[in-house]
Swiss-Prot record:
Residue numbers binding a ubiquinone: H201
PROSITE patterns according to UniProt: CYTB_CTER (PS51003), CYTB_NTER (PS51002)
Function: Component of the ubiquinol-cytochrome c reductase complex (complex III or cytochrome b-c1 complex) that is part of the mitochondrial respiratory chain. The b-c1 complex mediates electron transfer from ubiquinol to cytochrome c. Contributes to the generation of a proton gradient across the mitochondrial membrane that is then used for ATP synthesis.
Other facts: Heme 1 (or BL or b562) is low-potential and absorbs at about 562 nm, and heme 2 (or BH or b566) is high-potential and absorbs at about 566 nm.
Biological classification of the source: Eukaryota, Metazoa, Chordata, Craniata, Vertebrata
GO cellular component, one term: mitochondrial inner membrane
Gene: MT-CYB
Similarity field: Belongs to the cytochrome b family.
Name by which UniProt lists this protein: Cytochrome b
Cofactor(s) recorded in Swiss-Prot or TrEMBL: heme b
Molecular function in Gene Ontology: metal ion binding; ubiquinol-cytochrome-c reductase activity
Organism from which the protein derives: Microtus pinetorum
Length: 380
């Protein structure tokens, strides 16, 4: 078996990636989220495949086909809720994975980090298009509002929006193409994940100290396979509790009303995992400015290697920047809350303050904190 593991062309690749992979001996549970994201992606592809067998991407039958899945298909309700809540679990793991990367300075592995940002955009695009498919009120109006933002692009904006819609409004053509893209994107994401792992294995994993760990590496299997398995069990338990006991807690009641272009819901908002970006978008009165801020809220992650001023890689031994980091986390939670609130006083001013704070902490305060810590170290 060992000879086959090390000699067989295909198994050899798996061996170097998941079995004999030299891994730092001190990586904590924060490094579990990569494997959990792999599990989430697998769950989403499998449940999505079974949903696609029964779903029809036509405006007249989309809503009723989802109802049919829940009522008439064997365990259709379970497949549908696993897929819907699986997206939420996916984003929870994604945000924690990115947060770990920021905290421990993993952005210094530039190729892996940039690949991760591309993956984040791809997953966000997939989730957005998936939310449109049930063709409820929030599906329709969410699609209308978000795609309409592209009309802010000077000169070509309106033409671009109509090209994406396939007409003069969100209609049959839009739903069909969104279904096609929603189906193909997870497979593109899977390919990108392999590239992400390829880049990661070029440099090896980071660790909580941020120091070079070449002198103290252990094989991935069995040490981290068993550790990942524990993480998987915890995730699956949380996932099944969410799916079986609180399936609708993260959804919007408006989406149980069929899409009606003549009736606008009082509060149009995306799924919870987009609310922070939606709050940043709404905090700027100008349409183009809002769109740019929305894009920049994710693209700013690509600039983190340039904004790194500290002599140390991680925040483990940097209390000032640690404080800034946790203020940033709190700020993102505030933005998520504001994104779900109506556009009125005091939510407008809170959203604007939180949006300014978000960019200021990343671009100004964290780099300054790094320089202050460098000076403190020099004094010692």
């Amino acid at each position: 078996m060992t000879i086959m593991r090390k000699k067989h062309p295909l198994i050899k690749i798996i061996n170097h990636s998941f079995i004999d992979l030299p891994t730092p001996s001190n990586i904590s549970s924060w490094w579990n989220f990569g494997s959990l994201l792999g599990l989430c992606l697998t769950i989403q592809i499998l449940t999505g495949l079974f949903l696609a067998m029964h779903y029809t991407s036509d405006t007249s039958t989309a809503f009723s086909s989802v109802a049919h899945i829940c009522r008439d298909v064997n365990y259709g309700w379970l497949i549908r809720y696993m897929h819907a809540n699986g997206a939420s679990m996916f984003f929870i793991c994604l945000f924690l994975h990115v947060g770990r990367g920021v905290y421990y300075g993993s952005y210094n592995m530039i190729e892996t980090w940039n690949m991760g940002i591309i993956l984040l955009f791809a997953v966000m695009a997939t989730a957005f298009m998936g939310y449109v498919l049930p063709w409820g009120q929030m599906s329709f109006w969410g699609a209308t509002v978000i795609t309409n933002l592209l009309s802010a692009i000077p000169y070509i904006g309106t033409t671009l929006v109509e090209w994406i819609w396939g007409g003069f409004s969100v209609d049959k053509a839009t739903l069909t193409r969104f279904f096609a893209f929603h189906f193909i994107l997870p497979f593109i994401i899977t390919a990108l994940v392999l590239v992400h792992l390829l880049f990661l294995h070029e440099t090896g994993s980071n660790n909580p100290t941020g120091l070079n760990s070449d002198a103290d590496k252990i094989p991935f299997h069995p040490y981290y396979t068993i550790k990942d398995f524990l993480g998987i069990l915890i995730l699956l338990m949380a996932f099944m509790i969410l799916t079986l006991f609180f399936p609708d807690i993260l959804g919007d009641p408006d989406n149980y009303t069929p899409a009606n272009p003549l009736n606008t819901p009082p509060h149009i908002k995306p799924e919870w995992y987009f609310l922070f970006a939606y709050a940043i978008l709404r905090s700027i009165p100008n349409k183009l400015g809002g769109v740019l801020a929305l894009i920049l809220s994710i693209v700013i992650l690509a600039f983190m290697p340039l904004l790194h001023t500290s002599k140390q890689r991680t925040l483990t031994f940097r209390p000032i920047t640690q404080t800034m980091y946790w203020i940033l986390v709190a700020d993102l939670l505030i933005l998520t809350w504001i994104g779900g609130q109506p556009v009125e006083y005091p939510f407008i001013i809170i959203g604007q303050t939180a949006s300014i704070a978000y960019f200021a902490i990343i671009v100004i305060f964290m780099p300054i904190a790094g320089m202050i810590e460098n000076n403190i170290l020099d004094l010692n």
